[in-house]
Amino acid sequence: MRNHSLARTMRHALLGLALCLPMAKPVCAKQTAATTAHLRLTIVLVRHGIRAPTQPGSELDRYSAQPWPHWPVAAGQLTPHGRAGMQALGARYRLRLAPPLGLAASGCAGTEQIVTIADSAARNHASAQALLQGMAPGCAMRYQALPEGERNALFDGGKAPAPPVRLEAETRAQLAHLQAVLSACHHGRCATAPPTRLLYEPATRDGSPAAASTLKLAGGLAENLMLEDVEGFDAAQLGWGRVDRAAVAQLLALHNTSFAQSKRPLPVATAAASNLLAHLLATVQAAVGQTPSVAALAPPSTRLLVLVGHDTNLATLGGLLGVQWHRSDRPDDYPPGGALVLDLLERDGAPLLRVRTLMPSLSALRSGRLDDEALASSTLVLPGCHGEALCPLPVASAWLRTRIDPAQVQVALPAMQSWPVPP
């Protein structure tokens, strides 16, 4: 009897196991459906692609013993390599972001549910075009933007004074390293003809205007070295042959530190990003059937919204959201093609908000091969969401509204035009 009982128990156990085999997948899916969150909308704020330094060589040369390398495009413009990189990023976005939203991973069907908005700088226009060429090749895609050079308050918000700058010991060491590179120093001996202007004086006092201007300039010069690297300058040109890629990664900390002190603090971030955040929140609210108090950035039917902005937009919005995303394998917190992502999900009929990043590696930017491993994704937790990465939308919305300065918010969107994407 005991053996018969054991046999029946085993048959029941095997039957239960069979219910979870592939042929019985719908049964198991039904059991877990209540805990599955479904994507309804993804919003991507992405930095434009690889560009030339924004200052012409004649200005940069004042800070270096040797002329800066020549670029294939004018100051601040997207390079051909940068355009190709944004096309590759667009193709990766389509493969990675579209299917979870119920959109096809290729072809033109459903592309009307993809909306793209770009800032008015020429590099942003060009980046938006390249991104959409990669995302939907051969399709009649369009993006929204103001004409080149016109101020767009979504990307160029208000201004506020930054707090006094502190130069910590590590930052001072990085400044001294960068100054040695600029001054053509080797083993303590420097070029006989020094730069016209020095970047860094060790006597610079914390909190002084000189500290602020030094860190801002250093961040920009360090980023120029990164841009040389990812553009593919050879070893003899990269930092005049005085830095390798590891040194560039170390010096990039100056750019991160500069933004940490000048862009992310709330007085600055609140003024700069309140308008953008208000319209992002309105877009999410409209997608769940609510009536926002300011204009949404896209119709409620939109599944993927991409905004092509700048590193400053990532920094100020990140500061306003109260999130950090530095990773040791991604030395630049704001690389070309780097993005902050807002996901609207639904679970058991309740809307949820998730914040994450998609950051390309410098090697991927250099090669132009933006495969899935090249984009590092980190999920971030809003401080007002009590440790929940999937934050109930009412909770997230209530906290985000406390971060927005109404005086900085414009109810209507800028009068952007619709631009066709060249074939």
Where are these regions (language model features)?
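Residue-level micro-sites within transmembrane alpha helices that shape
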Residues: 10-11, 24, 47
